């Protein structure tokens, strides 16, 4: 857990804390007794400004604001398809099963099923050199879409151990690598990625025709 402060001002979905206590820009915070999810959007010597991504009715000055110590992130793994999320990757179907059609204040649930087993084909072998974006496994997520599990950006090394093909959860360690700095890293099918940070791409092709859906956006 990161830095803890207290609410000084409330203006709709925006709250402020007096001074700069050491929060970071885009850091995720939990606001009030219901631990509403928010994000640090502005820092100055005089105050810290936070955007709360839930209804702030009932909040009052003096309530605690706890920093998470990391940016607001989403989990990327098999299970995203056929799911419905809100803007901070809360699974709406799962919350509805527990609480009904309306999301209660501070509702929390795992974004993805951590216990579901996925048929997994490992695509690397011991001794392979891998880098960010290398495909280490494939999972048939639907009948028509294969989820390709990639090495996280910024990571590279040599594969030292692999699990055999089989059924695994998104939290099971399936590949181990020796990184270029001499460390060891065990990899699962899950990546956590900051929502404000664009995913890196090797090439970006210019659009030459519109995507026509027939739906009004």
Q: Locations of the language-model features?
A:
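Short, compositionally biased
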Residues: 42-48, 78-89, 145-165, 184-201
């Amino acid at each position: 857990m990161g830095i803890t402060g207290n609410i000084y001002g409330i203006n709709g979905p925006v709250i402020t804390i007096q001074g700069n206590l050491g929060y970071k820009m885009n850091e995720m915070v939990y606001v009030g007794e219901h631990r509403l999810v928010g994000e640090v959007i502005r820092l100055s010597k005089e105050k810290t400004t936070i955007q709360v991504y839930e209804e702030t009715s009932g909040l009052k000055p003096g309530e605690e604001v706890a920093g998470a110590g990391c940016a607001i992130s989403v989990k990327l793994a098999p299970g995203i398809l056929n799911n419905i999320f809100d803007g901070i990757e809360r699974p709406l179907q799962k919350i509805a099963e527990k609480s009904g059609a309306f999301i209660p204040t501070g509702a929390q649930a795992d974004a993805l099923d951590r216990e579901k087993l996925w048929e997994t084909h490992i695509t690397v072998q011991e001794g392979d050199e891998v880098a960010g974006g290398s495909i280490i496994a494939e999972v048939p997520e639907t009948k028509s879409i294969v989820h390709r599990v990639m090495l996280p950006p910024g990571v590279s090394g040599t594969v030292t151990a692999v699990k055999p093909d089989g059924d695994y959860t998104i939290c099971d360690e399936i590949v181990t690598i020796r990184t270029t700095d001499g460390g060891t890293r065990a990899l699962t099918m899950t990546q956590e990625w900051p929502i404000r940070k664009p995913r890196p791409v090797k090439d970006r092709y210019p659009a030459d025709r519109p995507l026509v859906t027939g739906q009004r956006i």
